[in-house]
Amino acid sequence: MSAPDVTALLAELERSQPDLAEEARTAVEWLTGGEPLETVTQLDVCEFLWYTLPIKVGPLRPGGDHERLSRSLARLLQLGGMERYAALCVSPTTAQILRTYAQEGEDAGTSAYQKALEATGVLPPDVPELQWSMIMGPEELGAHVACSAALELAIVAGDDVDRSALTRRWLTEPRAELGGDSWLNRVHGERLNRWVLGRGPARRELAQPFEVRLYAPVTPQPLPALRKLLSLAASEGSLPLRLAPSPAALRLRELAERELGAISRDGARLAITVYGRHLLGSPEAMWEAVTRLLLARGEHEFEVSAREATLMLLADGVLMSPAQLRERVAEVVGGEGWHPATSLDDVTAPVADLVSQLTALGLAYSDDLVVRMDRPGQYAALAALRAHALRPRKYVSSG
């Protein structure tokens, strides 16, 4: 069967049902974006009917409504032999969602759309290798569409679909259409490039060498200081608080309790938590939790940028004085446009907090004169930067 031609289908509709042709033309142009009709997927149809149509497309005539537009599109798709997609256009789900938008507003309609989309089974889920972004670049969008199409085909074939397993396979296996590359590699490359090209020329210059260095996963390293603390807390159930530890040990205890949630207070003692036992039993989980923590703190993205610059400056094991480190971080972050003039005062707190974290964890040496990361600390910096660079893009709340 030949692929349906939109122009021919519209001409046929003009002859058979001229009252629907104009609205069908508008609907199909929005649906396809000028691409051939055979490239459309179920996800495309659902997103058009349940989001684009009620949010962006207005009725073409007085008294018209979105349900009429969807019925017009259904007739066009029927003529093209796309019965499954035509049925979606006139389904009770579509009618209910469009009425929800009309009667209860955009927020309620969007909520109904998201619930219905999840129920279709064609929405690729987040998987351990990749959390999908709200704002996708071209490569990620291509990966998302490809995974959705694979899910759709499996469902239509009547397979018992494990969405996560199929999505992971589709993302990680080499694809002939990508020249042997995988969609996951493409998405990671796109995200790394976007991260490098972030704010300001000074930051771009600092980040550029990391684009290649962060491409491959970083080998987890042992964290003996944290492991010892958790082991003590786990032995006989708790760790006495009356011990007089060093400042670094106090900071480690605070980090384990307040930032990781690995230990908790029990009167005059500290006891290991369920999560702490999980970390103690999995060096990989402990490494991931600690490295993600290095760039997770900060009430404002500015503080995260200061910590990020600190890690990049220290990642090669260079020896710097605390004053030099603060000055360089201020130079890098100052060019990102956060403030009219970023001063040392602005970066002092986030830099000092990060250095104290690294020192407490045994990942860096610091005193009043020098700061330097040892080899495990350099690996930790790379792992933290990689996780940050590969994070999904989210809409920024103005609240």
Locate the predicted segments by residue.
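Basic, alpha-helical nucleic-acid-binding regions used in initiation and control of genome expression
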Residues: 64, 68, 81-150, 272
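Short, amphipathic alpha-helical interface elements at domain boundaries
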Residues: 22-38, 42-57, 142-252, 325
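Leucine-rich, amphipathic alpha-helical/linker segments
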Residues: 185-228, 233, 283-334, 392-399
